[in-house]
Regions:
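A short, solvent-exposed, low-complexity linear motif enriched for acidic/polar residues
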Residues: 1-146
Length: 146
């Protein structure tokens, strides 16, 4: 993600959110200009009336083998999922130069920090009845971002 107009100087932390503020989350992609990141219908969950903020997807091997043959898709969204992160990091911004700040998500912590996610029984999150499970994964995500 590219951010412009940060004054040059030395910074000791970065603060950012994963999610969409409630007022924006209440809107649909058609309500935003084409240049907005929120204009993409691929990131909107019409049945939840919410954007998807974090979407780990892939294949896993559930039987202990090395054959990754089971799909998983854990889509996190809703007003309750918006989380702000404060990460201590020395950052120097110099006029006219690009500064990169790497943010890492430890997926092992995402699946198994506060609560162990039972991916065998819940390999997909696509329904409002799964909101309690999604909230547990959001709590795990809080410990996984660094």
């Amino acid at each position: 993600y590219k951010i412009s107009d940060i004054p040059s100087g030395n910074y000791s932390a970065v603060q950012f959110g994963i999610g969409v503020p409630k007022a924006s989350n209440a809107k649909e992609p058609k309500d935003f200009s084409a240049s907005s990141i929120l204009s993409s219908p691929a990131e909107y969950w019409s049945s939840w009336k919410s954007y998807i903020f974090f979407r780990p997807e892939g294949k896993i091997a559930l039987d202990g083998s090395t054959v990754f043959d089971t799909d998983f898709a854990l889509h996190l969204g809703s007003d309750d999922a918006l989380t702000t992160y404060d990460i201590s990091r020395t950052i120097q911004i110099i006029d006219g130069q690009t500064t990169n700040v790497d943010i890492t998500i430890d997926m092992q912590k995402f699946f198994n920090s506060v609560t162990l996610h039972d991916i065998e029984n819940t390999p997909q999150i696509h329904s409002l009845v799964q909101l309690p499970i999604m909230k547990k994964l959001v709590e795990n995500l809080k410990t996984a971002v660094k």
